[in-house]
């Protein structure tokens, strides 16, 4: 008695996978890093930890898990960051520029966003308003899923001119890409707000606290 064999070829073979692995740029973007040397240092350190990250199909990326923890023991330094409406020095200040740059690129790559939080202010380093992504310890994370059929790889680095580059490589099977943009509908000028302080004598001319930055508001679409 003989049993006929029915051979079924897999849709995705090893040879096909290797031939198509990371062959396409799914999204890419660069931003310029300003500020003191500690900020550049933190961004460079985070970019090195992010660089080379590979996500298999269906896997979810966590920015905090990849570049954290945001501590001195982990290698980060104190630099400017936003806290409660103020610009103050805190450990790992500057890393939100990398998370924002990465978010911008994932939108271009048409990847599925799982978690993203906006800043209180427009930081000014993103070319498109609304493409920022703030992160902090275990409270705020930036996460996205590889919703493609192939693995994807992240390349990130800070060049000698303090320009931050992020590129996502994968296999483009759909030809669908995003190009984020914004349109400023209206501008709301900032207003000075004076707060009483017991240590300042009554009648003294008010001074602006240097720890507070003034920003115009934008309504964008």
What are these regions (language model features)?
Residues 1-221:
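Well-ordered beta-sheet/strand-loop patches within structured domains
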